[in-house]
Amino acid sequence: MSNGNDNSLIIKNIGNNEFKFVETLHELLPEDITYDDLGSLRLSLSERLQESVKKLDANKKTYEDAKLSMGEKMDDLNSSIVSLLQELSTLQSVAENTQSSIVQMTSEIKNLDFAKQNLATSMTMLKRLQMLVTAYEKLRTLRQNQKFGEAISLMQATLQLLNFFKKYRSVERIASLSRSISEFQKSFYEQVFDTFQSQFKKESGMRGGFSPSSVQYLNELCRFIDIFAGDPPESVIRWYCRHQLEDFMKVFRENEEAGSLENLPRRYTWFKKLLQTYDQLHKPIFPPHWKVDFRLYEVFCEETKNDLSKLLKDDRLSLQVFVASLEQTLEFESFIDHRFYNTKSRFNSNFEPKERQAYNALSSVFEPHYTLYFNQQSQEFSILFENFALEKQTSTDESSQVLSSSIKLFQAYRKTLTQFVRLTRSSPLVGLKNLFIKWLRRYTQVELLDYQESSTFKDIAIRLNTAEYIYRTTIELEKRFQEISNKEFKDKMSFSEVLEVISSSRGTLLKFATGKFENVLNSDLEPLSKMDLKNIETVGDQSSYVGGAVQNMTAKASEFLSVVDLNMFARNFCDRSCESFTRQFLNAIYLAKPISEVGAEQLLLDLYSFKNALLKLPDLKQDYSITDSYINHLTIFMGYIETVLKTLLTPASPKAGFIQSYIFLVKDRSVTNFTVLLELKGVGKSDISSFLQQFSDFVKKTPQLEESSPIFKYLTINTAVEQAATRSRLSLDLAPESSRTLQNLGRLFTSKKKHV
């Protein structure tokens, strides 16, 4: 019963969207279905099919009815669209007619506006034309009566009216009137200019000078002339300047003595009097914006520059006259600067370039001729260096930490710069900088690096201090040059090239100091190289040479460290001393070979004394204490020597023990280095090949070894030893792993060559 209800539910779900055919079929036809159940299932499916057919018929009928209704509605819609289009066409026709009417009305209004505007313009033009004609007639009357003051405002109005009628020049009467007025203005201007010249000359020649009425009259003439140009009229100003300087030109150009550089102050005094005359008599005549006094200075400047250019090219010119003339010129420019720019300093960098060019025009003529100054200064520096050489021979100052000559050199530099900056701060300052660089280079070569092998450690330390002093002072000098120079030259005030030379000299001096110290170590360790370290039987106290060597080494280091200023130099010297000692000690024991186990133990004891002495090196400089980095540095290099000596402590027999000790301590695979240790150990040449064979076997089993230990960079290896090691290494590469004699290896190598 239950099964029938389930089937009914399943059959009802057959039409669903999520209907699953396979699963539904399995549910309707389970494995345990009976024949009776099939009949019932068939009946249910038939009923379901009939229901579906009925629903389908109903849906078809509904669709047909809807389709019929939709057709009727489409007919109505098409009819409505046709009607709407007809109405739109009618509206468009009405709109076009309306637009045409509006355009016609607007056009009529515009025509009325244009007519009104043209009428107003015509009235204005006729009125202004009447004004122009009236002004023209009145100006002609004023010209005849020479009433120039009254004509000023009327002429201004006439010029404005003429400017208005420029666009109407196509009208013949207006064009003719404009030409007549322009010709009148030109002739009127020339008449006023001529009147100004004659009146000015007349008043200048009178004993009483310019009367108030004549000043007013001349001022009216200038104001009339000023109307014709927005800028100051060049012709009037130029005439005035030439007129005022006429006597000046005659005196200083026609008379050779008056025009010489020695009489340059007279030129400047004369011009100052001209300016004084201008201030007292002529200033009220000219409009202020003409700046006639400055233009007078410009013309004077132009003429004086031409004269100075010729005078400065004279080969007979002395430095004394050159400097005196330049100083007088600078003093005059300072006066001009104060008058026209109202500044306290002649070197005010806020001036515009054009203004600087104007007030600095005279002194700039001297700039190409500063070679005369530089040559003289170079001679003075040459004499100074000769004195340095004499002082070097007679110097007895034991307390100085730097060469006194370096202080004197920079004192001379400061004195020269102080004098020079009063003369110029422009391009010649670059020449002075180059001169200073030249002599700084010379000083570095002659005073710092011109040392002898006989130079003491104190001498070297003083030179090193001097190099540092020069380096720091040159940087300050560079800053000073940049501060005082004009801003367009600041980028050219670099001392970098000579600073590199000085910096390089510090490194050279340090290298020389450590090289000299290494020579001391070489002499002190010479007894070690001659010791019999093979037959020594017992280890006692330190060897006899150690005390003297330590004492001498400490004394020489103290001689340098107690004088050198910078801790950086002291640290560098101490670091290099460790390296030098390592090199000399290893080379000494190499010369003292062979070394027995007892000999190696004795050397370790001796090394301890040297290590303590090297550890105390930084204490030899005042206010400088030992650092952890120096201790680490010393430990590394003493470790190199200790590694060699500890390897030599191992007996040569058994061979494997010595080889293992080498690999454990030295940690490299170099046949050359191992051969050196065998040499130091005193292994006979006949036994070396067997050592090398076993060494090769051990190396193959220890791939993590270095190619070569850094220890052997500090040991000078005999060329013969190196060649023997190379031959042995070649033999080992060709030999089989089994032990063979060198003769068999040689025959094998020969047979292989023939076979090839």
Swiss-Prot record:
Residues 44-130 form a coiled coil. It comes from the Eukaryota. It is found in: Cytoplasm; Golgi apparatus, trans-Golgi network membrane; Endosome membrane. The modification Phosphoserine is found at residue 728. GO terms for biological process: Golgi to vacuole transport; intracellular protein transport; retrograde transport, endosome to Golgi. Its main location: cytoplasm. PANTHER family: VACUOLAR PROTEIN SORTING-ASSOCIATED PROTEIN 53 HOMOLOG, VACUOLAR SORTING PROTEIN 53. Involved in retrograde transport from early and late endosomes to late Golgi, leading to the membrane fusion between late Golgi and endosomal vesicles. Belongs to the VPS53 family. Component of the Golgi-associated retrograde protein (GARP) complex. This is Vacuolar protein sorting-associated protein 53. It comes from Schizosaccharomyces pombe (strain 972 / ATCC 24843) (Fission yeast).
